């Protein structure tokens, strides 16, 4: 038992030998002194180094003409600011030295520059808006016409040159009258008036009484067949298939008789064509202003010359 105790006690120097081999005897172990150097700080001892951020770069504002731009901090100021920063924290020194006064001066200068620039920009915008309101108010309020609203387009007075009488050509155009009815016999007045018609479907289809009858009685199919079967380019039988004066009259009527067995609506074409002629005559009789007499004498009516009026304004 004693031998084991001696061997157990002798093992400690053997373990401590390699740890202390690089250090002379009598020197203290730094790991033993480390817990003595660390100090625990309380909440009262902890305080902020600086309250504001030194990096203050405001929005760029254009300087006014009368103001000089504030000088930017030079390299010397930056160097002073870097030197003015506190040193890194060490465990043996809990208190830190205050910042350099040059850094605080540069910080105050930059803040004042930003505030002065923002004030100048607000003054400029306020002055420009007030000047615009002043100009608009003066333009609307100036003059006696500001309170009056124009609702009707003003009409210009007629000039004496615009009130000219009819020329001799216009008067002589309707000078020839019929001896029996007394109506004008000029070409414009005696021309027959057709029934009204109009273009529909974006001016692609003509809507007229004749086209309504052609499509309603299936005569358009007969016209298309005659057009494709005709060898003569000058043959107009496709335009008027029921004509008796054109060539191939018997052939056309025979073909229409055979087609009427399959298209019974072709039998309504001739009665519809007669009704169209009757309506055309009635419309022409009502709307034609000229003479409709076939054999009548023409009388030339002389229009008395009227001296031109004097359209001068009374004084």
Swiss-Prot record:
Compositional bias ranges of the Polar residues kind: 1-14
Main location per the UniProt record: cytoplasm
GO terms (BP aspect): animal organ development; bud elongation involved in lung branching; cell fate commitment; cellular response to leukemia inhibitory factor; cellular response to vascular endothelial growth factor stimulus; ERK1 and ERK2 cascade; establishment of mitotic spindle orientation; fibroblast growth factor receptor signaling pathway
Post-translational modification summary for this protein: Cleaved at Pro-144 by the prolyl endopeptidase FAP (seprase) activity (in vitro).
Keywords, comma-separated and alphabetical: Cell membrane, Cell projection, Cytoplasm, Cytoskeleton, Developmental protein, Membrane, Microtubule
InterPro entries referenced in this protein's UniProt entry, alphabetically: Sprouty (IPR007875), Sprouty_domain (IPR051192)
Compositionally biased residues, Pro residues: 88-100
Pfam families, per the entry: Sprouty
Subunit structure and binding partners: Forms heterodimers with SPRY1. Forms a tripartite complex containing GAB1, METTL13 and SPRY2. Within the complex interacts with METTL13. Interacts with RAF1. Interacts (via C-terminus) with TESK1 (via C-terminus); the interaction disrupts SPRY2 interaction with GRB2, potentially via disruption of SPRY2 serine dephosphorylation. Interacts with PPP2R1A/PP2A-A and PPP2CA/PP2A-C; the interaction with PPP2CA/PP2A-C is inhibited by interaction with TESK1, possibly by vesicular sequestration of SPRY2.
Domain notes: The Cys-rich domain is responsible for the localization of the protein to the membrane ruffles.
Entry-linked PANTHER family: PROTEIN SPROUTY HOMOLOG 2 (PTHR12365:SF8), SPROUTY (PTHR12365)
Protein's recorded name: Protein sprouty homolog 2
Organism per entry: Bos taurus (Bovine)
């Amino acid at each position: 038992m004693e031998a084991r105790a001696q061997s157990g006690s002798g093992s400690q120097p053997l373990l401590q030998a390699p740890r202390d081999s690089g250090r002379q005897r009598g020197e203290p172990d730094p790991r033993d002194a480390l817990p003595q150097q660390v100090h625990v700080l309380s909440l009262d001892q902890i305080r902020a180094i600086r309250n504001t951020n030194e990096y203050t770069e405001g929005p760029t504002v254009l300087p006014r003409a009368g103001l000089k731009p504030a000088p930017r901090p030079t390299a010397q100021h930056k160097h002073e600011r870097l030197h003015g920063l506190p040193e890194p924290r060490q465990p043996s020194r809990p208190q830190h030295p205050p910042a350099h006064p040059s850094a605080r001066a540069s910080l105050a200068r930059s803040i004042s520059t930003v505030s002065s620039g923002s004030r100048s920009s607000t003054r400029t915008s306020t002055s420009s808006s007030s000047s615009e309101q002043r100009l608009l108010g003066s333009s609307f309020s100036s003059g006696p016409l500001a309170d009056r609203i124009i609702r009707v387009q003003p009409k210009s007075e007629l000039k004496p040159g615009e009130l000219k009488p009819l020329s001799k050509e216009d008067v002589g155009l309707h000078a020839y009258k019929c001896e029996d009815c007394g109506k004008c016999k000029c070409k414009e007045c005696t021309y027959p008036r057709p029934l009204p018609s109009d273009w529909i479907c974006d001016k692609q289809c003509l809507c007229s009484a004749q086209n309504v009858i052609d499509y309603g009685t299936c005569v358009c199919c007969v016209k298309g067949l005659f057009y494709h079967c005709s060898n003569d380019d000058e043959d107009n039988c496709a335009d008027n298939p029921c004509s008796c004066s054109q060539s191939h009259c018997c052939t056309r009527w025979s073909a229409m008789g055979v087609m009427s067995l399959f298209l019974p609506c072709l039998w309504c074409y001739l009665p519809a064509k007669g009704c169209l002629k009757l309506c055309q005559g009635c419309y022409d009789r009502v709307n034609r202003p000229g003479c409709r007499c076939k054999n009548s004498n023409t009388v030339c009516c002389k229009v008395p010359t009227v001296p031109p009026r004097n359209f001068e304004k009374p004084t």
